[in-house]
Amino acid sequence: GALDGGCHFKGKLVRFGYIELAEKHSNFLPPNEKIKAHEFHYYDSTDNGADCIATKPATGRSYDCVISHDNYWLGFPHLYYPSNPHFAESFVRKAYEYRRNKNGKLL
């Protein structure tokens, strides 16, 4: 597949609930900023990524997640974009840059 690891049905909810995500290395978010999200899925991966730290606000429990690099940000969390508009701005900017660099011209 496109990513390392495998994905498997677990038969129950995995990492269910609200979280806040912080990038370990600023890529889509400015340094020290977070974005809110939630997770509710029945599948799990053998490689959930380690480029972000997810923290449950209610308990403080945290875990690694998300596979991120220059122009992609992949993972199970469902992001709440209004909680940090910088993320959406970065996403659009990176998509624009990718398209420009891929084709060598703007459309």
Label the predicted regions.
Residues 1-27:
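Cysteine-nucleophile active-site neighborhood
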Residues 3, 40, 78:
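Hydrophobic, well-ordered secondary-structure elements that form the walls
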Residues 8-11, 30, 77, 81:
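Hydrophobic alpha-helical scaffolding
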Residues 12-14, 49-51, 85-88:
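Short conserved micro-motifs at the rims of enzyme active sites and ligand-binding pockets
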Residues 15, 34, 81-85:
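Electropositive phosphate-/nucleotide-binding environments in soluble metabolic enzymes
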Residues 23-69:
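Catalytic beta-strand/loop cores that center a nucleophilic Ser/Cys/Thr
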Residues 71-107:
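Acyltransferase
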